[in-house]
């Protein structure tokens, strides 16, 4: 039976042991901080990137992996035959998925590239489910069908404590209906249809707490498969959210620091709640 290999990009927020256990290949993006280019793979140590960003004169810039890197990785993974399923962050956030498609067309490997519509742990949900099915020996059609199912039952919510990074990074245009002049404002957004859509905004910590209470009310009526919480900066609020949410899902909630790619755009003291519902 043909082995299917799973590839994703480093905007995914995932436990290193899962990557190893499920044999997932992660293609790193790069980040430029004050004219020094770092591979995202070298910035995974807790708090390392945030410190570099705080000390930098300018906002870091992220770059998608080069097309040639994708082509080489795909070629290498298929030396012994087999197929590749590459699942990447939304095209609205980065040109990574397009670079993967171009890399696939340059290689002789049998590659299918999927836009996850998400990033962070919401991307992880699709990648992990695909990798589990690949290890079970399922065919590409079955895996793609399940990945689509996971995508359609996933929600991504993000809270930021400042809009400064989103504005400077040019991402504010993709956040509909927010005035970029309101920089120091707390905003909760949902990523839906490749767009960040504001849900609530306000100036104090109550903004986040009130929204969380509303989310909890809605969760009590739904069958939740898993929840992930990601954060930038202090993990205090992330832990508080975990305590409030764990009762609504059987599987332990994973609380993880998000990577440099996401932190560049969200700034410090940002968080995300990623929810996958049962189909």
Swiss-Prot record:
Signal peptide: none
Superkingdom, taxonomy of origin: Bacteria
Keyword terms, alphabetized: Lipid-binding
Gene Ontology MF: a single term: lipid binding
InterPro entries: DegV, DegV_C, DegV_domain_contain
Cell cycle in keyword set: no
SUPFAM superfamilies, sorted: DAK1/DegV-like
Keyword Lyase: no
Pfam family of the protein (one): DegV
Positions annotated to bind hexadecanoate: 62, 94
Domain DegV: residue ranges: 4-277
Role, per record: May bind long-chain fatty acids, such as palmitate, and may play a role in lipid transport or fatty acid metabolism.
Protein name: DegV domain-containing protein spr1019
Upper classification of the organism: Bacteria, Bacillati, Bacillota, Bacilli, Lactobacillales
């Amino acid at each position: 039976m043909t082995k299917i290999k799973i590839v994703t990009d480093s905007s995914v927020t995932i436990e290193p042991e899962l990557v190893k256990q499920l044999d997932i290949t992660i293609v790193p993006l790069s980040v430029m901080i004050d004219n020094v280019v770092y591979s995202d793979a070298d910035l995974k140590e807790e708090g390392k990137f945030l410190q570099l960003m705080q000390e930098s004169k300018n906002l870091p810039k992220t770059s998608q992996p080069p097309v040639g890197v994708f082509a080489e990785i795909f070629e290498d993974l298929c030396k012994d035959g087999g197929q590749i399923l590459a699942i990447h962050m939304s095209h609205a956030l980065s040109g990574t998925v397009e670079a993967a498609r171009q890399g696939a067309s340059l290689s002789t490997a049998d590659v299918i590239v999927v836009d996850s519509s998400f990033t962070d742990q919401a991307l992880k949900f699709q990648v992990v489910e695909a990798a589990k099915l690949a290890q079970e020996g399922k065919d590409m059609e079955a895996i793609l069908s399940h990945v689509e199912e996971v995508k359609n039952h996933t929600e991504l919510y993000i809270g930021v404590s400042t809009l400064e990074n989103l504005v400077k990074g040019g991402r504010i245009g993709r956040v509909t209906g927010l005035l970029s002049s309101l920089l120091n404002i707390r905003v909760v957004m949902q990523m839906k249809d490749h767009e960040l859509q504001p849900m609530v905004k306000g100036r104090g910590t109550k903004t986040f707490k009130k929204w969380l209470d509303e989310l909890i009310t809605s969760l009590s009526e739904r069958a939740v498969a898993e929840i992930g919480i990601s954060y930038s900066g202090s993990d205090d609020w992330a832990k508080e959210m975990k305590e409030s949410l764990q009762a609504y899902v059987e599987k332990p909630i994973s609380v993880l620091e998000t990577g440099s790619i996401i932190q560049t755009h969200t700034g410090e003291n940002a968080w995300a709640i990623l929810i996958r519902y049962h189909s």
